[in-house]
Amino acid sequence: MAVCIRLARGGKKKKPVYSVVVADKRMARDGRFLEKLGQYIPMKEGGTFAINQERYAHWISQGAKPSETVGKLVAKQQNAAEA
């Protein structure tokens, strides 16, 4: 089973809210997932991103691959925390 960490779209028309989820790569974008790790709201000023770092690290250690977008958001959050 190929597991990935990706964004699942929710919210209203023209006002997206994305959930950061762990899902089987074969499932639909907004379909079944294994665990919800956090949330990304791009419409707020600067974008609001929150993720459970402990669970994220757990899934990475288990072999889950983050999507390109999730990888960038996590790296941006870690850089902001260090500064």
UniProtKB/Swiss-Prot annotation:
It comes from the Bacteria. The keyword Nucleotidyltransferase does not apply. GO terms for cellular component: cytoplasm; small ribosomal subunit. One of its GO terms (biological process) is translation. Keywords: Ribonucleoprotein, Ribosomal protein. One of its GO terms (molecular function) is structural constituent of ribosome. The keyword Ribosomal protein applies. Belongs to the bacterial ribosomal protein bS16 family. This is Small ribosomal subunit protein bS16. It comes from Magnetococcus marinus (strain ATCC BAA-1437 / JCM 17883 / MC-1).
